[in-house]
């Protein structure tokens, strides 16, 4: 996103070099300008390309970050460039939604989630997945809530799913009593969340 992340990582001494890929001309030009403004043209190469087309195996990339888009789109990007990931040791993924679909794709393509984080900003919640190659099996709950996030129960995680319970409770109040199937579906979703949060009914 405008090369902000590689610029920050270089300034903090966490990486040695980076390729910043942008698919749209405007952000591409913005990224070029930001890199130049920080005097990092020799460390960050900005490329106009779609997804993993921004790099080649000869670039010897060890870590790829894809952030700020839906989980399904991230999975599509990874699928389109799957053959390029053989020598990439780590993925850092930040889906804005459909986190469960992304986790399912990763498991089905022999990737394992080694760590997760969640943060809240401006009343929005963002989950971050750190992924490496390797087999992993996840339960349906782990796919939805995140295996590490479930275990760690960070304040932002509890806040996110507590808000979801509030939304579902409100939706349940709007469903007529005679509509048992809809009510049962909502009640089941509420129960699953409360079980993960260790909250009694």
Model region roles, listed by residue range:
Residues 1, 69-72:
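Short glycine-rich anion-binding loops that position phosphate/pyrophosphate groups of nucleotides
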Residues 54-59, 63, 72-201:
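Class I S-adenosyl-L-methionine
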Residues 19, 45, 90-92:
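A structural signal for isolated positions on well-ordered beta-strands in alpha/beta enzyme cores
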Residues 12-14, 36-41, 83-86:
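Short helix-capping segments at alpha-helix termini
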Residues 17, 43-45, 112:
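Conserved beta-strand segments of alpha/beta enzyme cores
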Residues 5-9, 31, 44, 74-78, ...:
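Hydrophobic packing residues within well-ordered alpha-helices of enzyme cores
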Residues 2-16:
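Conserved SAM-binding loop of SAM-dependent methyltransferases across substrates and taxa
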